[in-house]
UniProtKB/Swiss-Prot annotation:
Annotated positions of the Phosphoserine modification: 187
Protein name: N-alpha-acetyltransferase 35, NatC auxiliary subunit
Superkingdom per UniProt: Eukaryota
Basic residues bias locations: 558-571
Localisation: Cytoplasm
GO CC, alphabetical: cytoplasm; cytosol; NatC complex; nucleoplasm; plasma membrane
Stated family: Belongs to the MAK10 family.
Subunit details: Component of the N-terminal acetyltransferase C (NatC) complex, which is composed of NAA35, NAA38 and NAA30.
InterPro entries, per the entry: Naa35/Mak10
Region (Disordered): 548-573
Source species of the chain: Macaca fascicularis
Reported function: Auxillary component of the N-terminal acetyltransferase C (NatC) complex which catalyzes acetylation of N-terminal methionine residues. N-terminal acetylation protects proteins from ubiquitination and degradation by the N-end rule pathway. Involved in regulation of apoptosis and proliferation of smooth muscle cells.
């Protein structure tokens, strides 16, 4: 049957069955069964009619339509209740718009918070926040507390959505920004909403004070209960106001707004214990006739927006539990506090490290977006005050001290040299901003994007080498004792190597590699990337020292006083040390995997449609766009890692001994680092047990066993603890 013409589209009856709908509506229905069958007779057996208006998409939709498993709209036919929108519920008397009791307010507010969090975790507004009917149109609400709260939630959603859209570090699995045509309280200003919340807060505070117990007075249980409930509503309203004010603060361009947000976050954190302790005071879901996880209580209707969803939308959004809501908010507050700390950093390298460390915690999309918009404000300046070009120049000075950026150098005031370096620095801005933005994406997407940005850095590397050569030629004419070789090139190469290392290591975190692939990933890291990184860091350190010597000689010429030489801590020494530790860990894992393979402890797949070479080339494919360091192709790798070139070729016991030495070396390097951070301690938790296990294996422990070992990545994401089974 088809619907020929609609006379009256009645929304309220959409949950009725088909025959009931036909009886109830004024729609003119036409039976097309006979016409359809006659048309089909004209087709021969096996013949299909392909109309240009009926392609694969329409065919799939036809299969899905009205199938309860695939058509979200069919859910309405499976529930035993009438699905009402806000206006209908008010008429029906199933929802209160005034004189809400304190337990009702607490229950509705808590469920709204749960819906808000579920939305931030990637579900749609239609299935989360807008299942609360009060949010649909706060103008209808007469209860001041409920009205202010509903407007507050709408404003929080609106600003959060704007922030996430502006930062553009989300993918479809992270965040749904569609508002489905709902009004986001745009007719009311942010200031008015915070004012309304403050009025309710003050009113509740008065009630809290008036019901407080007095010394020597016998306590009435009812008054005590009212006191607890008033305190619960007060805490929730204040928390909403503080959270909204924090998001408003992040929309300001001034850095002082971040300090304001920091103070407010402390206030928000203090309210969480009161919210947690009063969860039981709120009304709970009365019944659950939808077979889903969504609580059904006054003011909520999980199916109210079902018609707004695409036909094959997931049936239910699993709304988080109230107990989890408080701990989620606690973590969100901690993340926002961390975001506020970024404005204290001045060096581009430190900012980049901050973004990497923040990303490692897999933060939510809102905190990732706030970090991005705090770093690069609307005016395209870092923190709204610094030019990105100046940040790049400072990073160059602190890393390689290029003569062209030294005020005492001839090139500093040379117009041609100035144009060269300024042009190069301007070209650096886009790739570095993109790199920082990549660290705002979720971990899985980051890896893919790191592979692509290598192309931009390869182009930058090429330009850096050309600029270095041009500046070196200019410098030799005026100051022959100075060099400008590989200064800018060293700096870009350093970032190139960091991206390549991060790309490979993230594969362990995302569990992309099979056990039989570990050996060539760890080989590439230890023998190639970390070796290049350490020589790059040493070259940068050498450039710094050469520039410092020239500066000291110039100072000596001017001052006749003898200055006491203090032992200076080299700026890159810690990074060089950490790279040595990482290289030893990778070398240890490579030799461990080769030895396990010799002992038959590594299960390899029977390659049919691919081979080890195909897998190897796929793993390192993004590196083909990079000229320096040149990519190591599979045949080169096999040749370089071939043990038969040694005489005699080492056997598994020797390899276990060699691996144990690498783990021991990493352990010694890390134990000598002053003020070890979390990363140092995490690697030590792997290096120590692996050293012991390698010693056991070298001594012949479980030599005959062919059971594959276990690799436990719980202590560190990139280096597993080897466990013998």
């Amino acid at each position: 049957m088809v619907m020929k013409a609609s006379v009256d589209d009645d929304d309220s009856g959409w949950e009725l069955s088909m025959p009931e709908k036909m009886e109830k509506s004024n729609t003119n229905w036409v039976d097309i069964t006979q016409d359809f069958e006659e048309a089909c007779r004209e087709l021969k057996l096996g013949e299909l009619l392909h109309d240009k208006l009926f392609g694969l998409f329409e065919a799939m939709s036809a299969i899905e339509m009205m199938d309860p498993k695939m058509d979200a709209g069919m859910i309405g036919n499976q529930v035993n209740r009438k699905v009402l929108n806000f206006e209908q519920a008010i008429k029906d008397g199933t929802i209160k718009i005034k004189d809400l009791t304190l337990p009702e307010l607490i229950g509705i507010m808590d469920t709204c918070f749960c819906c808000l969090i579920t939305w931030l975790e990637g579900h749609s507004l239609a299935q989360t926040v807008f299942t609360c009917l009060y949010i649909h149109n706060p103008d209808f609400i007469e209860d001041p507390a409920m009205k202010a709260f509903a407007l507050g939630i709408l404003k929080i959603c609106d600003i959060a959505r704007e922030k996430v859209n502006k930062a553009a570090v989300f993918e479809e699995e992270d965040f749904q920004s569609m508002t489905y045509g709902f009004k986001m309280a745009n007719s009311v200003t942010d200031l008015r909403v915070t004012g309304m919340l403050k009025d309710v807060e003050d009113d509740m505070q008065r009630r809290v004070k008036s019901t407080r117990s007095r010394q020597g007075e016998e306590r009435d249980p009812e008054v005590e209960l009212e006191h607890q409930q008033c305190l619960a509503v007060f805490s929730r309203v204040k928390f909403t106001r503080v959270l909204l004010t924090v998001l408003i603060a992040f929309t300001k361009k001034e850095t002082s707004a971040v300090a304001e947000a920091q103070k407010l976050m402390v206030q928000a954190a203090d309210l969480l214990s009161a919210i947690h302790n009063s969860l039981h005071h709120g009304i709970q879901a009365q019944n659950d006739t939808t077979k889903g996880d969504h609580p059904i209580m006054m003011g909520f209707e999980p199916l109210v927006n079902q018609r707004l969803l695409p036909p094959t939308f997931p049936r239910y959004a699993k709304i988080i539990k109230r107990e989890e809501m408080v701990s989620y908010f606690a973590r969100l507050i901690d993340r926002i506090k961390t975001v506020c700390e970024v404005v204290n950093l001045t060096n581009l390298h430190c900012i980049l490290d901050f973004f990497c460390e923040f990303s490692e915690q897999s933060p939510c999309v809102l905190s990732r977006s706030l970090l991005q918009t705090t770093f690069l404000v609307d005016n395209k300046k870092v923190f709204g005050t610094h030019l990105m070009q100046d940040m790049v120049k400072d990073a160059l000075r602190s890393f390689v001290s290029p003569p062209v950026l030294s005020p005492k150098c001839y090139l500093y005031n040379n117009h041609q040299a100035k144009d060269c370096i300024d042009s190069f620095v301007t070209h650096c801005v886009r790739p570095f901003c993109s790199l920082i933005q990549i660290h705002g994406h979720n971990r899985a997407r980051q890896r893919d994007k790191l592979g692509h940005i290598l192309e931009e850095f390869a182009t930058l590397q090429d330009e850096a080498e050309k600029v270095d050569a041009a500046l070196h030629t200019m410098l030799l004419k005026q100051e022959p004792q100075r060099q400008h070789l590989a200064c800018l090139g060293t700096w870009v190469l350093y970032h190139n190597l960091r991206i390549m290392i991060q790309y490979l290591l993230s594969g362990f975190e995302l569990e992309l590699y099979s056990m039989h692939e570990y050996y060539y990933i760890y080989w590439y890291l230890s023998e190639f990337l970390y070796a290049w990184l350490m020589s790059t860091l040493s070259r940068a350190d050498g450039s710094q020292m050469a520039e410092e010597r020239i500066m000291e000689e110039q100072q000596k010429g001017r001052s006749s006083k003898k200055t006491k030489k203090k032992k200076k801590v080299r700026p890159l020494s810690r990074e060089i040390t950490m790279s040595q530790a990482y290289q030893n860990m990778c070398a240890g894992m490579f030799k461990t995997m080769v030895a396990f393979d010799m002992d038959g402890k590594v299960r390899k797949p029977k390659f049919e449609l691919d081979s080890e070479q195909v897998r190897y080339e796929h793993r390192f494919a993004p590196f083909n766009s990079v000229m320096t360091p040149p990519p190591v192709h599979y045949l080169q790798f096999k040749e370089m890692s071939d043990l038969n070139k040694y005489s005699p070729p080492p056997q598994s016991p020797e390899l276990y001994v060699a691996a144990s030495k690498h783990f021991q070396q990493a352990k010694m390097i890390l134990e000598n680092i002053p003020n070890p951070d979390h990363e140092v301690n995490r690697i030590l938790k792997v290096a120590k047990p692996n050293f012991v296990v390698m010693k056991l294996l070298a001594g012949g422990h479980k030599k005959e066993s062919k059971v594959p070992p276990e690799f436990d990545f719980s202590a560190h994401k990139y280096f597993p603890v080897v466990k013998l089974v």
